[in-house]
């Protein structure tokens, strides 16, 4: 269980920034030295990812109900916690569970990864990203991306 997403490193040539650096290569050099400032919207989205990871740890990674409840009480004190966010995350987790069960129906040998760092250096030097949920079973690969927050429209 990793959970602290706010201190993650960011790749210079990230997958999420590919539209910009592919269409405007000079932007890579131009952005060097500029601090990566977060916004409340990004922080809220990061919190949603951390909360979803807590749920996945309970469902798939052996976190006990006691440990979940204790951690969840701490999450409820976070400035970004709201019932709306909790409901959104629970809906996302339910969707992932549905996809996981579909994968099990194809093949009992399911690979499921949650909030996993992906090395993309083979394709773009020094590039990496995070796979929110990756499910592989019976020759089918599903990549599920959590989008939460406000302020900037994101296409996924």
Model-identified regions with their sequence ranges:
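Accessory terminal regions of nucleic-acid processing enzymes
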Residues: 1, 53, 57, 153
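Generic start-of-chain signal for non-secretory N-termini
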Residues: 1-11
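Nuclease catalytic cores
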Residues: 10-60
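General structural signal for secondary-structure boundaries
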Residues: 11-15, 81-86, 154
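A non-catalytic, helix-rich entry segment at domain boundaries
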Residues: 43, 47-121
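Mg2+/Mn2+-dependent nuclease catalytic core
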Residues: 106-156
């Amino acid at each position: 269980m990793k959970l602290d997403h706010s201190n993650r490193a960011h790749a210079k040539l990230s997958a999420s920034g590919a539209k910009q650096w592919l269409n405007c290569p000079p932007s890579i050099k131009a952005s060097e030295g500029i601090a990566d400032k977060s916004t409340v919207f990004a922080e809220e989205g990061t919190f949603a990812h951390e909360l979803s990871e807590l749920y996945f740890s309970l469902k798939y990674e052996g976190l006990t109900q006691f440990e979940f409840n204790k951690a969840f009480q701490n999450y409820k004190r976070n400035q970004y916690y709201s019932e709306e966010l909790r409901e959104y995350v629970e809906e996302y987790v339910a969707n992932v569970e549905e996809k996981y069960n579909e994968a099990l129906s194809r093949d009992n040998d399911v690979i499921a990864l949650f909030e996993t760092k992906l090395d993309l250096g083979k394709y773009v030097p020094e590039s990496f990203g995070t796979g929110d949920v990756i499910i592989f079973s019976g020759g089918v690969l599903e990549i599920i991306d959590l989008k939460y927050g406000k302020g900037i429209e994101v296409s996924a």
